[in-house]
């Protein structure tokens, strides 16, 4: 089911047999599962707002519910601290994304690293994407500024597209960096096949909300959709370590 910020929210079932006197976790799960048995609930916990629970879905997305699961809130939860509105939802979603992205084994990515990296970015990329090619041309500058670039595959036209086939060839090349360089400069890449993570990475991208390339994930899990010039991107990436 495509949640797209949860259109199911406004159709909650009012007849759940679980009451507030029961375990809220059980009540919330029962009500949400009655809407969609395949809803990917990963965790339920009390939110900072009294009486409201936060539901973490697969991919890091957050929902908010009453303790009995009968009321569902869609959108962002803010907390005012020192006169500023802090987006708690964005923080939680970024934290969940960071946990998944930073757990990808290095051997499953194509990595361009400086000698002494200060931070890293993970880039969902496609080989025939113009802005992906532009970003790749600035990887040496990003490395010079201390940013390690980790590529994961995201064929925009799907797993049966020519770009997906080329991404597989890049991941299966003996020299992945050289193959990536060739692909990003519109040169031919020798066709190759092997056991590869392209499909898995594509599915991960869909799960966390990637819908175009390049999609850049900072070390803290915050996502930047689209190309950013190297100096600006490096500044944002380095600040994400704070």
Residue spans for each PLM region:
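Hydrophobic helical h-region of N-terminal Sec-dependent signal peptides
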Residues: 8-14
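N-terminal signal peptide c-region/cleavage motif recognized by signal peptidases
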Residues: 15-19
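Thiol/selenol-based redox catalytic cores and closely related redox-interacting motifs
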Residues: 41-42, 52-57, 61-64, 68-85, ...
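Short active-site neighborhood of thiol/selenol oxidoreductases, capturing the structured segment around
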Residues: 112-133, 148-149
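Bacterial N-terminal signal peptides that target proteins for export
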Residues: 1-7
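Loop/turn elements at helix/coil->beta-strand transitions in domains of secreted/extracellular proteins
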Residues: 117-120, 145-150, 176-179, 213
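Residue-level recognition of beta-strand->loop/alpha-helix junctions
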Residues: 153-155
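Extracytoplasmic c-type cytochrome modules immediately beyond a signal peptide or single-pass transmembrane anchor
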Residues: 24-111
């Amino acid at each position: 089911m495509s949640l797209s910020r949860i259109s199911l929210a406004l159709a909650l079932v009012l007849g759940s047999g679980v009451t507030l006197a029961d375990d809220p976790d059980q009540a919330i799960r029962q009500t949400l599962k009655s809407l969609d048995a395949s809803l990917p609930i990963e965790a339920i916990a009390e939110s900072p707002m009294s009486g409201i629970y936060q539901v973490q879905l697969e991919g890091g997305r957050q929902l908010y519910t009453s303790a009995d699961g009968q009321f569902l809130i869609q959108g962002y939860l803010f907390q005012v601290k020192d006169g500023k509105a802090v987006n708690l939802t964005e923080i939680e979603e970024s934290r969940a994304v960071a946990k998944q992205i930073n757990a990808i084994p290095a051997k499953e990515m194509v990595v361009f690293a400086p000698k002494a990296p200060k931070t890293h970015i993970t880039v969902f990329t496609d080989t025939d994407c113009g802005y992906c090619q532009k970003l790749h041309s600035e990887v040496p500058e990003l490395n010079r500024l201390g940013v390690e670039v980790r590529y994961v595959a995201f064929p925009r036209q799907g797993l049966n597209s020519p770009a997906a086939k080329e991404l597989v060839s890049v991941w299966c090349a003996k020299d992945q960096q050289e193959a990536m360089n060739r692909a990003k400069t519109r040169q031919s890449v020798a066709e190759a096949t092997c056991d590869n993570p392209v499909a898995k990475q594509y599915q991960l991208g869909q799960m966390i909300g990637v819908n175009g390339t390049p999609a850049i994930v900072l070390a803290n899990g915050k996502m930047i959709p689209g190309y950013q010039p190297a100096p600006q991107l490096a500044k944002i990436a380095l600040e994400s370590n704070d």
